[in-house]
Amino acid sequence: MNGTEGLNFYVPFSNKTGVVRSPFEYPQYYLAEPWQFSVLAAYMFLLIVLGFPINFLTLYVTVQHKKLRTPLNYILLNLAVANLFMVFGGFTTTLYTSLHAYFVFGPTGCNLEGFFATLGGEIALWSLVVLAIERYVVVCKPMSNFRFGENHAIMGLALTWIMAMACAAPPLVGWSRYIPEGMQCSCGIDYYTLSPEVNNESFVIYMFVVHFTIPLVIIFFCYGQLVFTVKEAAAQQQESATTQKAEKEVTRMVIIMVVAFLICWVPYASVAFYIFTHQGSDFGPIFMTIPSFFAKSSSIYNPVIYIMMNKQFRNCMLTTLCCGRNPLGDDEASTTASKTETSQVAPA
């Protein structure tokens, strides 16, 4: 084995020279240079500085403006809440531990940090699934008279939390476990060992199938159908400038959604899957740390893509920040007209 396994940790470094120490008790400078831990801390600080204001502002602006309290925006708010879970439950902890170069909070703190980071990430992921389904049902109209209402939004919210808990909670009760990963300053699911005493192999397979592959398939299917529907509508109305504009907006939005999802999650999932299927292989701590950077950055991507590109929300945000006046001069009528104009084919 090219790593060192302990009671509640796995360090990706051979202990042939006897230098490996518990990541809960000693700095891990044999894994990476001090400046690399400083870079990790600086990155976490950047995510906190950017992630907290934009997600908090999302919640605050929605509370301030009643017209934003629509069923679809419930899901967008759920994204903001999930991102705040990641900011406070994961990023702040990783910032502090990176400054010390080891996980100073012990196994209990590791369980809590791993749980909240996983919970926030999964809530965000399943929120994107609900958004994809909502867009598919509203735009493609597989059910002709269906209208996405408040009850459907509440059911969607419940689904995101149930599925997130179904992924984040089992390691706390003996099915798999949370251990320090990468540079040993943050915690995640144990992809590194089979750990038969906690049935780790079955949990990792379950997580990859139910909490990664299935969401990915749903998102691609829904947005693929969305693009086809919009193109078909445009083909039938060649002279409709409104439809042509909506086609471009939806296509751009879909591309950004899919690319952001892939950038955020596929590198991390791919590396984790490789590590799990190549037990004992030789890899360094940076091998897992860098992909996790992209996954954590979803706390910034999500509000920018799903909310900041919404013209109505953007106008409300500017009005809130500028004490009741919109410096861009976009009046309510133009915002309403724009929203109505693309309501049948463009994202809300």
From Swiss-Prot:
PROSITE patterns membership: G_PROTEIN_RECEP_F1_1 (PS00237), G_PROTEIN_RECEP_F1_2 (PS50262), OPSIN (PS00238)
Subcellular location: Membrane; Cell projection, Cilium, Photoreceptor outer segment
Region annotation (Interaction with SAG) ranges: 330-348
tRNA processing in keyword set: no
Post-translational modification: Phosphorylated on some or all of the serine and threonine residues present in the C-terminal region. Contains one covalently linked retinal chromophore. Upon light absorption, the covalently bound 11-cis-retinal is converted to all-trans-retinal. After hydrolysis of the Schiff base and release of the covalently bound all-trans-retinal, active rhodopsin is regenerated by binding of a fresh molecule of 11-cis-retinal.
Chief location bin: membrane
Gene Ontology MF: a single term: 11-cis retinal binding
Name of the protein in its database record: Rhodopsin
Biological source species: Delphinus delphis
